[in-house]
Amino acid sequence: MSSVLDVTKPDFDVEAFVVKLLREKSLDGLVKEEEEMVSAVRRLDSDVHQIVYENYNKFLTATNTVRKIQDEFTQLDSEMKSLSRSMSTISTLIGNLDGVLGEKRDDILQLGSSYKVVNSLKHIFDLPHVLRSEFDERNYGEVLRMFKLAEESLSQYKDVPTVQLVLQKSKKIYDMTENQLMDQLRNPASGAELVSEAVDLLLTIGRDEDEVQKVLLTCSEQSLRVDLKELSANHSDVLDLVDKASESFIPNLTLIATTHDRLFEDKREDLITVLKTEMNSLHALVSKVFLSSSDAKDCSIVVRALDRYFRKISTCRYVIPGLDFLPLTIELINAVSKHEIDLSLTRIKEELKNGLNEVRKALINEEKDLSALASKIEQVFVHQVKTALANLLLFTASDVTFANLPPDEFRQSFSFNAHERLLVQAFHRFSELADEYESGAGEIRFVDPRVHLVFAVALQHLSNKSAVYLLNLCREQFSLSPDDGLTDITVVMSEVKTRAQKLVRCYAEKTGLSMGETLIKGCAMLVQPAATPSAVRASVRRLVEEMNTCDSELTLLLGGDSKPKDSRVSRRPITTALDAARDSLWCERIDFHLQIHFNRASIITVIVKVVLKIFIESIRLQTYSKFGVEQVQVDCYYLQRCLAALVSDEVVVNSMVDQALSSALKRCQDPVLVHPSRLAQLCEQPPANRPSSQASSLGY
């Protein structure tokens, strides 16, 4: 029954197949079955057309072939008929000739034998010419073979003068051939095939094997040295050097080893000695070029060259057993990685110096945005460190062959050096640069004190955030853990913060010293005052203005609000010399070495301390009249009122101002102080425009 329903069988029943489909299939199933059958019929029709087309082409081809064969057979039949007629004619001629020459058969045989002898003699006499021709065509093997055969055959006739002359000429060509083979062996430009041919022929003719091997090794050594000389003289960079060595020196080395092993298998030690000497020379040249790199930007080129060199040396170890330069290559990889770390470290310091020089120029050009300058210094450091780490990551890339060495041979020490020798040392170099600016040696001695401030703020920001980020980034990128003996993060942060403290103190002290010197120069006494003071001296007012400007800069840089500049003095002014003497006994002790915090008030306080200390010491060096003391009192009152609003602790200003006034009172024989009510009036008055000589008389 199944064959009746199979469309591929001869007894297929259409009606039974349709009935079966109507019974088993739904309407959708019938539609789908119809589509499948239509598709199958179309495919079958297409296949039939394709088969017919292909068979038709084959039929045409076969027809052409049969026609061509038929034509060839027709031509062959004609040629065979012609050949048959020619053979019949030849057969007839041979029969006739046999009858004519039959009587002289013995004479003909004797004549043939004589001809052979004459022909042999002709070959003997032509031997030197033939050997010379083969020599000129560089068929040295044929020259040697023919001479040996001739020498053996003619040795019994060597007493014959003619034969002796032939042998002498042939021997001369033979010796020339032997010498030419030796020259070919000695020539460094000879290829491997020529060298092999020369060695084989020389050994075949019995040349001393040790002599031939020695000449071969000498020639090989010279060839390798020529390659080394060419490499040393002609290379653009380390990658070019390695590529050229891979194309010339190393293939030549491998070919020499292969040729020698084939010819002198039992004398390999001499070969290895020569090859090691030349490989040491190559390694020294490559190492010199690798370690002479001076630009950290070429790190990618260095890594590519190092990887290619490593792969070539690894291959040589298997191709030439006994020539293992892999340990030296691994040492070179470690040395080059350290060299690249040192280059990156040098570049970081150079970029930092350039960034600081740009900050100095910006401040000379009256740049006001100190915060942007501080951020610039920090960003220069962060960017350069991240760039250096990215370059060093090339040494551990997945496509770098030597990155897959055992960790204790390369990666472990390299990762440690990336953290300690690069990153930690970069922070050390940054700190050393801060020490240079703090010590003020050389040209740095005359820089704007604000450079120290900007530098200090950059270091402070670095220690608060970026330092931790960079250290963690390095440990993550190079798979390091604290158990690897790494420098603790807190140590690095502490070092940076210490330098920031030194720099900000340097800024405060230099700024205070500069302001104090300006104040003293403006207040230098030329003539004792002849009358009671009428206003605060201009130099004192300028000091307050400079202090307010400094306060504004610090506020913009460090944030926070400035104290109101018009705050009033909350303590009772000194009215008599006795009060001043009594207050001086209870003056607050001023500590000039307190830690400076990175805020406006703390820094301003240190500046004010330095200025007032200079002011006090200058007063102690003078002798005052009654009016001079009054002028000092007015100036002190003004300083107390204006500076107390800026510092973090008003007691500091009050105490130091009291010391200044007390010192002036001690330097006067008959001191009289201005009444407190008049002090306020004098401080409120604007500076008077007086002639310079009169203004000078207000000094003390």
UniProtKB/Swiss-Prot annotation:
Paired cysteines (S-S): none
Keyword match Ribosomal protein: no
GO biological process entries: endocytic recycling; Golgi organization; Golgi vesicle transport; lysosomal transport; negative regulation of dense core granule transport; positive regulation of dense core granule transport; positive regulation of locomotion involved in locomotory behavior; retrograde transport, endosome to Golgi
Coiled-coil residues: 61-87, 345-380
Pfam families, alphabetized: VPS51_Exo84_N
Compartment(s) where it occurs, according to its Swiss-Prot or TrEMBL record: Golgi apparatus, trans-Golgi network
Domain of life: Eukaryota
InterPro entries assigned: Vps51
GO CC annotation: cytosol; EARP complex; GARP complex; membrane
UniProt keyword Coiled coil present: yes
Keywords: Coiled coil, Golgi apparatus
Knocked-out gene: effects: Mutants are viable but have enlarged lysosomes. Egg-laying defect, slow, but coordinated locomotion, and reduced levels of unprocessed and processed cargo in the motor neuron axon of the dorsal nerve cord.
Chief location of this protein within or outside the cell: Golgi
GO molecular function, one term: syntaxin binding
Tissue-wise expression: Ubiquitously expressed, with particularly strong expression in neuronal cells.
Subunit structure: Component of the Golgi-associated retrograde protein (GARP) complex, also called VFT (VPS fifty-three) complex, composed of vps-51, vps-52, vps-53 and vps-54. Within the complex interacts with vps-53.
Family named by the database record: Belongs to the VPS51 family.
Protein purpose: Acts as a component of the GARP complex that is involved in retrograde transport from early and late endosomes to the trans-Golgi network (TGN). The GARP complex facilitates tethering as well as SNARE complex assembly at the Golgi. Plays a role in the trafficking of cargo to dense-core vesicles, probably through association with the EARP-interacting protein eipr-1. Important for neuronal function.
Name assigned to this protein: Vacuolar protein sorting-associated protein 51 homolog
Phylogenetic classification of the source organism: Eukaryota, Metazoa, Ecdysozoa, Nematoda, Chromadorea
